[in-house]
Amino acid sequence: MQVLSSLRSAKNRHPDCKIVRRRGRVYVICKSNPRFKAVQGGTHKKR
């Protein structure tokens, strides 16, 4: 899964790609071709 700052190009990679919001993050999921998965946003872990 790729971590991207913008999902604008990721959502147009394949006709089956969908955008889903889960737990404050934005995901691109693609069941027919899972290599197009991507995520944007979320919280950062503290060290």
Swiss-Prot record:
<keyword id="KW-0689">Ribosomal protein</keyword>
<dbReference type="InterPro" id="IPR000473">
    <property type="entry name" value="Ribosomal_bL36"/>
</dbReference>
<comment type="similarity">
    <text>Belongs to the bacterial ribosomal protein bL36 family.</text>
</comment>
<dbReference type="GO" id="GO:0006412">
    <property type="term" value="P:translation"/>
</dbReference>
<dbReference type="Pfam" id="PF00444">
    <property type="entry name" value="Ribosomal_L36"/>
</dbReference>
<dbReference type="GO" id="GO:0003735">
    <property type="term" value="F:structural constituent of ribosome"/>
</dbReference>
<dbReference type="GO" id="GO:0005840">
    <property type="term" value="C:ribosome"/>
</dbReference>
<dbReference type="InterPro" id="IPR035977">
    <property type="entry name" value="Ribosomal_bL36_sp"/>
</dbReference>
<dbReference type="GO" id="GO:1990904">
    <property type="term" value="C:ribonucleoprotein complex"/>
</dbReference>
<protein>
    <recommendedName>
        <fullName>Large ribosomal subunit protein bL36B</fullName>
    </recommendedName>
</protein>
<dbReference type="InterPro" id="IPR047621">
    <property type="entry name" value="Ribosomal_L36_bact"/>
</dbReference>
<keyword id="KW-0687">Ribonucleoprotein</keyword>
